[in-house]
Regions:
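The canonical Cys-X-X-Cys-His
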Residues: 63-72, 84-94, 157-163, 181-187, ...
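Soluble extracytoplasmic domains of inner/organellar membrane proteins
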Residues: 139-141, 146-191
């Protein structure tokens, strides 16, 4: 019987298959790297802002509630960047309107009235042109996220934003990736607390497992994991 031999063109085909496999494998590896590497998903993103607003000072040392500035977070999908008038409550006045030197006046705030760092705030109050802040936490394209739903279901600001009250300059602490969101939706209980405590970033319950379980049951937390929840 005559021996069978593959035609010579098979050699080229074999090389083509190997090259295709390497190309596809490299592409998939690159996609995986892009999906999980902190530098790609913006973990640590810490842009400079037109006004060096310190959350460590305002939310930490002074104890301002998150909702004083982000006042739509309980009723709207977006947390909202505060209007300059909110800054003006403390920083928009001048010394002539103060009831006591160096302290806020009755109608206009005069805290740090001559600080050059706050000049963009004073300019904005005078011209009505908004201060152009740089976004820190940017979701991927075509993703829907509703702040009010999460806040009212007992998810604390700290779960997504970290200890903002300890940040001199705000930075992104979590990847905000699909996997990260799904991990919580599949097992939300450890992140659920009394809605009255969502802005208390330092809060630690005495018996975490029991506490979170009780509040998850009380609030009826059963998040969906279907695609349409986030992609609408």
């Amino acid at each position: 019987m005559q021996d069978f031999h593959f035609p010579t063109w098979v050699n080229k085909f074999t090389v083509l298959v190997i090259l295709t496999g390497l190309t596809v494998g490299g592409y998939l590896a690159t996609c995986l790297f892009a999906a999980i590497h902190p530098s790609i998903v913006n973990v640590g993103h810490q842009p400079r802002q037109p006004v060096p607003f310190s959350h460590k000072l305002h939310a930490g040392q002074l104890g301002l509630d998150c909702r004083y500035c982000h006042n739509t977070v309980e009723v709207a999908g977006h947390a909202a960047i505060p209007a300059t008038a909110t800054c003006g409550n403390c920083h928009g006045g001048n010394m002539t309107t103060a009831t006591e030197p160096g302290k806020p006046g009755r109608d206009l705030g005069v805290i740090q009235p001559t600080s050059t760092l706050l000049q963009p705030v004073r300019d904005s109050l005078e011209t009505w042109d908004p201060v152009v802040w740089t976004k820190v936490h940017a979701l991927p394209d075509f993703v829907y996220f509703n702040h009010s739903v999460h806040i009212n279901k007992g998810v604390s600001c700290v779960s997504c934003h970290g200890r903002i009250d300890e940040m001199e300059v705000v930075e992104q602490k979590e990847p905000l990736s699909m996997k990260w969101c799904l991990d919580c939706h599949r097992n939300p209980t450890p992140y659920i607390r009394d809605p009255e405590m969502v802005t208390n970033l330092a809060f630690q319950p005495e018996n975490p497992e029991q506490y979170h379980k009780e509040w998850a049951e009380k609030l009826g937390v059963k998040p969906d994991t279907s695609c349409s929840v986030c992609h609408r």
